[in-house]
Swiss-Prot record:
The keyword Heme does not apply. The keyword Transcription applies. It comes from the Bacteria. NCBIfam families: transcriptional regulator NrdR. Binds 1 zinc ion. This is Transcriptional repressor NrdR. It comes from Lactococcus lactis subsp. lactis (strain IL1403) (Streptococcus lactis).
Amino acid sequence: MRCPKCSSEESKVVDSRQAEDAIRRRRVCESCGFRFTTFERIEEMPLLVIKKDDKREPFNREKIVRGLVRSAYKRPVSSEDIETTVANVERKIRQLDSNEVESDVIGEFVMQELAELDDITYIRFASVYRSFKDVSELEELLKNITKK
């Protein structure tokens, strides 16, 4: 690993620890003695989302966050709940073993998570995601929720 101070290629690891999504390594340059930190992460496949019009765009977790924040407005859903939900959805997507996923699949994963979190947030999200044509479709969703 190149030293950021003297650019020497000779350094040794003096400490390794697991960080959130990486391994944190403390290093010391063998030439100048400078100590520095590096992080080692797994390089994940870039995810592409296949939209309804068959266009592809990079996966953007912030879009899910924004949708959840809107759906959870004035509901007892914390930002931590939203972050956990998004992390669970992203984990499910990455477990699909493909670097392309249809937007419908993402929406269904979000719905599964919201069904466990908060009914009103679930209904709000579903009303936008499923684009209900009339009240009967919403009534059907409400019947399914009340059966829980």
